[in-house]
């Protein structure tokens, strides 16, 4: 399966202490690449925050997190991130890897 994934649809982030204790900041270039294949995303939606699904296929858990943009510069997961990070047992230094599945319209967790 991994050989078939489009690298432009992957968001990868080494988690910092700030990401663990608060909201996770996401790499701008990677998020912008994924946004090109997301349906129904608007500037207003990004500024206000919009819900996306994140599927942990190993545990068959589905999370809902809010993707938000600040000042056209920073992207992050807000609401829902806390539940997701605790369920995935993520700690500082871990690499969060997510793949945007444009056909299912959700992220797939690649941390396995």
Curated annotation (Swiss-Prot):
Residues 19-112 bind DNA. The keyword Nucleotide-binding does not apply. Keywords: DNA-binding, Nucleus, Transcription, Transcription regulation. One of its GO terms (cellular component) is nucleus. This is B3 domain-containing protein At1g43171. InterPro entries: B3_DNA-bd (IPR003340), B3_domain (IPR051442), DNA-bd_pseudobarrel_sf (IPR015300). It comes from the Eukaryota. GO terms for molecular function: DNA binding. It comes from Arabidopsis thaliana. The keyword DNA damage does not apply. It is found in: Nucleus. Its main location: nucleus.
């Amino acid at each position: 399966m991994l050989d078939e994934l489009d690298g432009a649809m992957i968001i990868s982030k080494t988690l910092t202490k700030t990401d663990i204790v608060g909201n996770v900041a996401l790499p701008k270039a990677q998020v912008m690449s994924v946004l090109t294949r997301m349906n129904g995303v608007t500037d207003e939606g990004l500024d206000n925050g919009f819900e996306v699904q994140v599927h942990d296929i190993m545990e068959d858990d589905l999370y809902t997190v809010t993707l938000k943009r600040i000042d056209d510069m920073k992207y992050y997961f807000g609401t829902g991130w806390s539940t997701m990070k605790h369920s995935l047992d993520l700690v500082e230094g871990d690499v969060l890897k997510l793949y945007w599945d444009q056909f299912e319209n959700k992220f797939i967790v690649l941390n396995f």
